Amino acid sequence: MGDLSLDTAVHGSEGRYHGDLSDEWEIWGPNGGYLASVALRAVAAESRFVRPASLSCHFLSGAAFGPVDLDVVHLRRAKRAESLRVTMTQTERKVLEALVWMIDTAQGLHHDYAPMPDAPTPSGLPSTEELTDEPRSKRYSFFTNVEERPTSWIDDWEHREPGEPRMASWFRFRPVATFDDLVVDACRSLILMDTLEWPAAVRAYSGQLPWVAPSLDLSVRFHRFEPDCEWLLSDTTAAIATDGLIGGAASVWSATNRLLASGGEQMLCRPVPPPA
């Protein structure tokens, strides 16, 4: 089982940082949101501000578990905001490139017209582990790091009817559920927003599919933080698939019905490799 704060930690200074990708965050290799989280930690270490405003990244090549290097440069320094670029490399191969805005918290306009999705509370829902007979050993290690309580469930997955490509689940990280550090708290949203687009997309089809679709990019806006809130709702749609791309939008909500983060990503379809 991984620990989000420990497994995204970086060390270094003056624009040069190092991290170590943990295999506890595996889904088809290191989870994309996990990679973005390590990159965000490096940016936060370099910035004089503590509040992330947005992150946009490209996944450039597959990463392996183990050491990574992160180079961070300032693109703009202003009184209340900084724009920074971070490049993650592994054995001289570029893995990820991201742009991040970090800001100083300040007074400004305030309104909230974001409607909470219609979803039951997590307290009345069973966990994925209670809903499936699949042994934990057959699941990706990523899922040991979160307790998931889906708002809907398909019992007979192999014979499912095609439906709306949407998935919503409540998640609680484990073994540690909440983090006082705003950047680590933001990492919770980053990871959840990269996790459900493929499961949402495949709900539009039945049976086994001849394609998989890794993420090309990820873009997230951090609206607010509730670091004391254990349960987060991740609501994801993959509304369109065309030209070999699957486009999705995602949002993360607190158990107090407030929007924490929003964004989306594009995934690129690739044929499923033939059996060995």
Name each model-derived stretch:
Residues 1-276:
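Terminal targeting signals and extreme-terminal segments of soluble enzymes
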